[in-house]
UniProtKB/Swiss-Prot annotation:
Uracil binds at residues 194, 199-201. This is Uracil phosphoribosyltransferase. The gene is upp. Its EC number is 2.4.2.9. Allosterically activated by GTP. Its cofactor is Mg(2+). Catalyzes the conversion of uracil and 5-phospho-alpha-D-ribose 1-diphosphate (PRPP) to UMP and diphosphate.
């Protein structure tokens, strides 16, 4: 079974509580998603490799550490995933950004892929798939399927709020994909929404339904 890490940092939990509130404005919601994504980034990016580099300070020459130049890609699931991109790019500005677009079929309730735009060397990159919600897991599974079909193998999934059902589904479909989440909530309701959750992240990010 795949690994899941719930990031319980006090700042993240505080901001997440505000994010969940029904009276949080679209502007505040957007800012909070960005801030939480950046705070989560410190943990998500913990295992990036380092290398020695010789530098000169005002005092002396010294050998210090720098990122080893590992190729990274941030891949949001459209549309809500877009809200998490800048927070991570603030930490790793050299990362490339791909996009996977999906919508839900109203009859089958299954996700349907309508857009895939990825860096040409996606198979050589460490990939962070981002989406604020991991509910049923359908979109996450389809996104990872799409990446693996194009040769990607080093994939992590980053979300703000997750449901046990979605975590289980993603872990069973892709046990090699590590999941990072700020909250593991109680369950899904009969409409497929996370409880207590935060509503529809895309609607709240963009102020449209």
């Amino acid at each position: 079974m795949g690994k899941i890490e719930v990031i319980n940092h006090p700042l993240i939990q505080h901001k997440l509580s505000i994010l969940r509130r029904t009276d949080t404005s679209t502007k505040a919601f957007r800012e909070l998603v960005d801030e939480i994504a950046m705070l989560m980034g410190y943990e998500v990016l913990r295992d990036l490799p380092l290398e020695d580099v010789e530098i000169e300070t005002p005092i002396t020459k010294t050998v210090q550490k720098q990122l080893a130049g590992k190729k990274l890609a941030i891949v949001p699931i459209l549309r809500a995933g877009i809200g998490m991109v800048d927070g991570l790019l603030n930490l790793v500005p050299a990362a490339k950004v791909g996009h996977i677009g999906m919508y839900r079929d109203e009859e089958t309730l299954q996700p349907v892929e309508y857009l895939v735009k990825l860096p040409e060397d996606i198979d050589q990159r460490q990939i962070f798939v981002v989406d604020p919600m991991l509910a049923t897991g359908g979109s996450a599974i389809l996104a990872v399927d799409s990446l693996k079909k194009r040769g990607a193998s080093n994939i992590k999934f980053v979300c703000l709020v997750s449901a046990p059902e979605g975590v289980k589904a993603l872990q069973e479909a892709h046990p090699d994909v590590e999941i990072f989440t700020a909250a593991l909530d109680e369950r899904l309701n009969e409409h497929g929404y996370i409880v207590p959750g935060l509503g529809d992240a895309g609607d709240r990010l963009f102020g449209t339904k």
